[in-house]
Amino acid sequence: MIAYNHTSLDNLIINEEAKAALQNNLISKEEAAGIENKYPVNLYSPNLFIRIGLLLLTAIITLMGFGVLCLMILDSSEKQFGIMTLIYSLVIYAGLEFMIYDKKHYRSGIDDALILFSIGFMVTAVNLMSDPISYLGQSILIFIPAFYFLLRFGNVLMAGTAFLSFLGIIFYGFIKLGDMAKSAMPFLLMTLALLAYWQVRKGKKNLRLRHYRSCFTFIEILSLLILYAAGNYFVVREVSNSMFDLQLKEGESIPGAWIFWVFTALLPILYIVKGLQKKDVILLRTGLIMVAAIVFTVRYYHHVAPLEIAMSTGGIIMILLAYFVTKYLTPPKYGFTHAEPNDPKLNGLLNLESLIVTQTFNQATPAEPEKGFDFGGGNGYYRSGLN
């Protein structure tokens, strides 16, 4: 389903693993060069600065082309303009497929920009050709192409868009069921976020879905944030008051407020504790960030101190928390340490041996097993830090 060449994607991961191993002095330069020659990558993926430049250039060209189109159909009706916009989005999509299939672009900035503009013009075109669409309809309209683009291109932004629009479908569909549904909405969103977190954690371990690992990681972070936001007192009170017209007065609480205060205070602590227990840096860092949300929420409704003192107190709490976590992890506890590896990519890459074995079994003709790489005198394959 994914548009990029599978073999090149696998070889890219292997090469990145080899570079990480080289930086950690686990293999020699000759061995790293041998891996690179044995597993060539036929993809164009420039560095970050060139990628940003190509993205901006593609955006300018795409918008200029659309501007010329607008001048040509200036006197057309809104529906005709929508049809032309839809055609233009399909042209952009065709260009995207061409750049990937023929020019071998992979996260070069050009394909990233074309993905965004293609889905953007598609959604705009449907809105122009249709009567006003409800929030539920908009969520469905965005989810369908975003999910397709996620499967087709493994794009991180499309993963986030598909996930959020799916939650939008649930949200706007569920609140139509009445007041009880509105009251239960925070708990439903928390449940969905928790289920999403468990599923993407399982998906990251599935070798068949290895090319979507970055998407899984992004959804994992989003699900943790949404789980907390759906249980945060400030978010629940203000969103409910705004969307459901509760007409709450200043100082007036929502029903069951104590439940959300408990979630507000305990979830970040739970994130931090579980992050330490599971050696999960995403849980740990998210929990540390959410400590600031606790301070903000408490300060917003309870003016126990001037703003400057409250902010200083919150900062001191976060610094002390980070300090004690650092001290706890020095020396390393149970294979978990505060120290950064030489190459951060080691935390997110797949197991090299698994990929080599997979490629070996996918060969049309059987090949003789090769001798493992020599790491400092011992034989065996390098393993990344992936659990």
Question: Can you say where each PLM-predicted feature lies in the sequence?
Answer:
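Alpha-helical multi-pass membrane segments and their bilayer interfacial helix-loop junctions
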Residues: 2-387
